[in-house]
Amino acid sequence: MSKVCIVTGKRPATGNNVSHAQNKTRRRFLPNLHTHRFWVESENKYIKLKVSSKGMRIIDKKGIDTVLSDLRAQGHKI
């Protein structure tokens, strides 16, 4: 299961854990993803999307219908 936001495209970034002694070990910074059900009034059904919290704010701002049409235009099967 990929850790990618379907709306924003956010994916894991890499970096270092740095201890007090400045020892560095590699780590991954994971996006804040949630599987969320959105009610789509035009289709009269729920759509389940894996989105980050930023993606949820974009859906709140633009509307689920606009975001879904953009995703379908990009080739996502939803």
Swiss-Prot record:
<dbReference type="InterPro" id="IPR034704">
    <property type="entry name" value="Ribosomal_bL28/bL31-like_sf"/>
</dbReference>
<dbReference type="InterPro" id="IPR001383">
    <property type="entry name" value="Ribosomal_bL28_bact-type"/>
</dbReference>
<dbReference type="GO" id="GO:0003735">
    <property type="term" value="F:structural constituent of ribosome"/>
</dbReference>
<dbReference type="GO" id="GO:0006412">
    <property type="term" value="P:translation"/>
</dbReference>
<keyword id="KW-0689">Ribosomal protein</keyword>
<dbReference type="GO" id="GO:0022625">
    <property type="term" value="C:cytosolic large ribosomal subunit"/>
</dbReference>
<dbReference type="InterPro" id="IPR037147">
    <property type="entry name" value="Ribosomal_bL28_sf"/>
</dbReference>
<dbReference type="InterPro" id="IPR026569">
    <property type="entry name" value="Ribosomal_bL28"/>
</dbReference>
<protein>
    <recommendedName>
        <fullName>Large ribosomal subunit protein bL28</fullName>
    </recommendedName>
</protein>
<comment type="similarity">
    <text>Belongs to the bacterial ribosomal protein bL28 family.</text>
</comment>
<dbReference type="Pfam" id="PF00830">
    <property type="entry name" value="Ribosomal_L28"/>
</dbReference>
<keyword id="KW-0687">Ribonucleoprotein</keyword>
